[in-house]
Amino acid sequence: MNARLDATRVASILARVAQARPRVHCLTNTVAQNVTANMLLAFGAIPSMAVHPDEVADVAAAAGAILINLGTISPEGERAIPRLLELARAQGKPLVLDPVFVELSPLRMRLAEDILRLPGIVVRGNGGEMQALAPLLAATPGATRITTGAVDRIEAPSGLFEIAHGHPLMTKVTGLGCASSALVAACCAVEPDPGLAAGAALTAFGIAGEIAAERSAGPGSFAMHLIDALASLDEATLLTRMG
Amino acid sequence: MNARLDATRVASILARVAQARPRVHCLTNTVAQNVTANMLLAFGAIPSMAVHPDEVADVAAAAGAILINLGTISPEGERAIPRLLELARAQGKPLVLDPVFVELSPLRMRLAEDILRLPGIVVRGNGGEMQALAPLLAATPGATRITTGAVDRIEAPSGLFEIAHGHPLMTKVTGLGCASSALVAACCAVEPDPGLAAGAALTAFGIAGEIAAERSAGPGSFAMHLIDALASLDEATLLTRMG
Amino acid sequence: MNARLDATRVASILARVAQARPRVHCLTNTVAQNVTANMLLAFGAIPSMAVHPDEVADVAAAAGAILINLGTISPEGERAIPRLLELARAQGKPLVLDPVFVELSPLRMRLAEDILRLPGIVVRGNGGEMQALAPLLAATPGATRITTGAVDRIEAPSGLFEIAHGHPLMTKVTGLGCASSALVAACCAVEPDPGLAAGAALTAFGIAGEIAAERSAGPGSFAMHLIDALASLDEATLLTRMG
């Protein structure tokens, strides 16, 4: 099923990120900002995180992709969202939505409804979040839906991809799912097929997680090893790990 | 004095947290959010950190306990506080106040005054913060007062507890005191006696700190080891360390 | 050129920080808050990070120095800036500006223009940021301009200092430049010559970075080792590393 997503293809997309160094503008929650920025840097991309409605479009204008993560959304972040949507629409810029805890908040559900109207939207959430969004997503043709878990499932216009990498410790560290959404955005900045882009990002993230788990003494040391592993991931490692 | 807080009792409260996996809704400062969330996850609890006044009550509604930490309070966070107080009052949900730097800010003192009106409130601060609040606390019957330091002192309706665990490095890492307040909240979600709940949380936190200090090369590596130690703390370790 | 900035001079300024334990009030971006606070603590200083316009001047009033960092500036942070400028002006308190991504945001450029009117202002940015500010800085007599990079260049009223310490990994971890600005502020709290203060801070920071690079397996573990190295930096190490 993943014939089109072998180690060579993943390595090629990662190499394009490392060469192009795309900036990913992240309107993201304050809990995950730091680990998200460090993960993007380790991946070869550049983070920017402006949130002020009066500057967010200026700062995001030259970014290669945009991430909107609804965790700890603030009133100012809420006002920044339409600016980013307008920019993404006008420039055809890739945009990834991470609907953190959307199942708990009617406010986030309303914001997600607006965001999902963007053509070509990519959404990454966990099982509960994606289930809560299912009725909206059913009415969103052309969206790429990514449900992460023990096996990540990517439903893209170009087909279905499943990624079976990663480690349970990844659910014990805050912000890692959020950071993986930023990696998906970074790959979307260099690869026009969002299914392949998401597949490459989540394969790299999952394999870095496997390596980190072998080196960690628990959830405290895990994120550090994950970032180190991501920064040194090469095609040989991908080949070995992807079998 | 701590006859009722031996290793078996502490282990029993920790086991209830690990089994019930209570969600702790944290309205907390942006400096400490990440380490607080990771500490709660290592403890077996689930963090949520919404702050927007239009959603904070929705997100906190099904949480097992609430933490209000006044560090980096924002105008929106200020407006979120009454929503959380109303929720805690209506549901009888445990609420912990962490009055960061209250001695420096008349705004925080006013907010603390409102929060302390909540029946059954639990307050954890350092010596300076608790001293600044002393006049207010004197007029707050039924409150549980926790002053942390070289020896943590817990004055609860059920009695006095003193915890002599921990390490000086814990004062050299930002957000650890804030995170300990979140652990107190997690224990309050499963243990109705706030004195015992706070005692169990601070014993676990202090012992994890002792273990981390033995493994750390300085304050940079300390938090990581603390989280690793907290995630693997078991009754045998508690027994050994509590003598 | 740096005859006045030998290891003994640097050690003397660091010792004054460790003894006076100045509080540095940081109005800084939410991405860098945690690493900035931990770096200040490792340096022997105390961080405070209030941002609410109704309390920021109260909290900063007794601080030894102020940092204003424009990253992730919020509407409330924008309103806090004039309160901090008024305080710095009234008390003659040192103030450091970190103009993150000022080249991307007309809003930040306007804010920087206001801040640069403060007599004795110290500015630290990377090459792109300092170049964008060059026209404003040309009209700012008495300012200290710090351009960090492979070689840090400090142009102070008392002369020119160049610091050739550090490691490329320092650009791969988010918030380290921001944290270095906070260290400059901490030194300005104890040393009246901002050129010497900045030189001492950036020498310590750069040498800690060199030590960290020798101990790190990548950007994930780098910040931890940098903070450990900063916390244990002594005159003997400075002497060896400064040749």
Model regions and ranges:
Chain A
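Conserved phosphate-donor
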Residues: V122, A134-K172
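Glycine/serine-rich anion-binding loops at beta->alpha junctions
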Residues: T28-Q33, P168-S181
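Conserved beta-alpha-beta core of the PfkB/ribokinase-like small-molecule kinase fold
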Residues: V56, A65-L137, T147
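Charged C-terminal helix
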Residues: L5-T8, I207-G243
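Short, well-ordered alpha-helix to beta-strand connector turns
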Residues: R21, A63-G64, P119-G120, G142-A143
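Conserved N-terminal subdomain of the carbohydrate kinase-like
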Residues: N2-L97
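Short, small-residue alpha-helix embedded
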Residues: T174-I207
